[in-house]
């Protein structure tokens, strides 16, 4: 079996049998992203550990092409259980690969099934499809981190006021 065919099979499998699809509660942040070019959309929820250091859950719902929906499924598999820093490095690595127009192969050790989207980089119109869920994740982490920092700041402010 050719490598390209294997990659297509991985994408099709994640599209037909998505992982982590279905919005779950509780969650720390929720974002909704739409690709205005084609209408693909995703609502993505992120839950971080109490200290904000680890991704404990990601769930999503959406509609769109096989690339956008499969890429979001792969994203969830890769980042759940990772530290926020490592998860964001994975997002960066995926983004670089699919935006490279074929010049960056991607690291299978880092990207796992995400490597199947390497061929997308040769089709600029599809890059936004592949990145939709990944950028939604990045935005949700920023939102969750900001809210946990705000809670911590308010808590410390309240402690000072009580003294």
Indicate where each model-derived feature is located:
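C-terminal binding/interaction regions
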Residues: 1-25, 84-163
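Structured beta-strand/loop patches that form or line metal/cofactor-binding pockets in enzymes
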Residues: 17-62
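Glycine-rich phosphate/pyrophosphate-binding beta-alpha loops
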Residues: 36, 66, 126
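Active-site phosphate/pyrophosphate-handling residues
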Residues: 42, 73, 128
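A generic structural motif
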Residues: 62, 80-81, 133
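Short, thiol/selenol-centered motifs that function as redox-active sites or metal-ligating centers
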Residues: 62-69
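Alpha-helical macromolecular-interaction surfaces
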Residues: 69-70, 89
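Alpha-helical support elements that line or immediately flank enzyme active sites
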Residues: 71-83
